[in-house]
Regions:
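Binuclear metal-dependent hydrolase catalytic cores
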Residues: 2-232, 320-355
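Cap/insert and terminal regions of metallo-dependent hydrolase folds
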Residues: 2-11, 15-19, 221-222, 228-233, ...
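Residue-level structural signal for beta-strand termini and adjacent loop
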Residues: 89, 237-238
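Short glycine-rich anion-binding loops that position phosphate/pyrophosphate groups of nucleotides
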Residues: 212, 260-261, 359
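A polyampholytic, Gly/Pro-enriched intrinsically disordered region
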Residues: 356-362
Length: 362
């Protein structure tokens, strides 16, 4: 008994001494740890470590729903050492930073349509590219008709902030001409006369925009990126539509939005039970202009896509345990890999190869 008592007292004294010791040295220990973190993360640039090829980084796989694990819709495309962003959902600029992809490397932004959840994070992208990259000209922002109105609106909202930063840091650090964005609108052919148009062709990269069906939102487009024998399609928001299948023929990765109606109907019912009738109606409405995981899988199979990645996940999935319920019967329609997109995922397609490599950056 005495031995046991001594052991307990010794353990308590050791714990107390350790606590006192840690408390005494907490400040220098924390400073040292923070110094190491700063050294590791400042200037981090994963693009420099990637092989030549086409790469897809998911900087936002969420939707307008609150979701602690997913930012708003955003995909980063890296072609060789060039960086492009598709859609700029809220929080996605921070996610890009977590992934070690510097906003200063952005050459252009592409918007699929002008729903708020696809554009509400564009301000931080424009600001970070300008502030870190010291660009002399605004960020090009490509999109269908109306993109210049959207970009000009954000510029108007940020114009005071731009002025403050130039005044504080000097025009040398923040060149006034580089602030904001420049809308680069493109027109799709009239319906029935072709659904696609090449919007960028440069240094081996071809970006093709194609019409999708997100009615009543019009225009709405997806994008196909082709580089050195590799290809990625990003649909943007759409219900099942033939143009996605047509433009995804033989694509390496099809990034398709997905909504699971069975789970959305749970929300619809609960909103009604809580007498939140407006939200219950919204849950019913969103069912008619999105694509189910099963439909996305069927599209991927018909197109001969090598891999299907689902994004714009509706409703939010708090745990991976919920993924099978979200996917439903998708595997019955497509026998190749299906990935429920998560923020921080990186897919690498080495040039002139058939490999698809996966990595989680954070």
């Amino acid at each position: 008994m005495q031995r046991k008592t001594r052991w307990i007292l010794g353990t308590l004294l050791t714990a107390v001494a350790s606590t006192v010791l840690i408390s005494s040295f907490q400040r220098p220990i924390a400073t040292l740890l923070l110094e190491q973190m700063v050294h590791k993360n400042v200037g981090r640039n994963i693009i420099a470590d990637l092989s030549d090829g086409l790469h897809l980084a998911l900087c936002g796989t969420g939707s307008p729903f609150p979701d602690p694990t997913r930012a708003g819709p955003c995909s980063a495309i890296i072609a060789g050492d060039r960086l492009f962003i598709v859609d700029t959902g809220e929080g996605s600029a921070r996610t890009l930073g977590y992934m070690g992809i510097p906003a200063a490397k952005i050459e252009a932004i592409f918007l699929t349509h002008f729903h708020s959840d696809h554009i509400d994070g564009i301000g931080p992208f424009l600001l970070q590219r300008w502030g870190v990259g010291t660009f002399q000209t605004p960020t090009p922002v490509y999109g269908p008709t109306g993109v210049d109105q959207v970009v000009d609106g954000f510029r108007a909202a940020y114009v005071l902030d731009f002025g403050y930063r130039v005044a504080h840091h000097s025009p040398k650090i923040m060149p006034p001409g580089g602030s904001g964005g420049k809308g680069m609108p493109f027109a799709l052919p009239p319906t029935g006369q072709g659904d696609q148009v090449v919007v960028l062709e440069d240094k081996g990269l071809t970006v093709t925009a194609f019409r999708v069906d997100h009615a009543p939102i019009d225009p709405a487009v997806g994008y196909r990126f082709d580089y050195k024998g590799r290809s990625i399609v990003i649909t943007g928001d759409t219900k099942k539509t033939p143009s996605v299948q047509a433009l995804s023929k033989g694509v390496d990765i099809l990034v398709h939005e997905a909504l699971q109606p069975k789970l959305v109907k749970l929300l619809e019912t609960e909103f009604a039970n809580q007498h939140m009738n407006n939200m219950s109606q919204v849950m019913r409405d969103i069912l008619n202009y999105h694509t189910t995981p099963e439909e996305a899988a069927a599209q991927a199979a018909a197109a001969g896509a090598k891999e299907l990645v689902l994004n714009h996940i509706v409703p939010p999935l708090p745990l991976r345990f919920a993924y099978p319920a979200f996917l439903g019967d998708a595997s019955k329609f497509y026998d190749k890999p299906i990935t429920v997109g998560e923020d921080g995922m990186l897919f690498s397609l080495p040039a002139n190869s058939v490999l698809i490599e996966h990595k989680k950056l954070y």
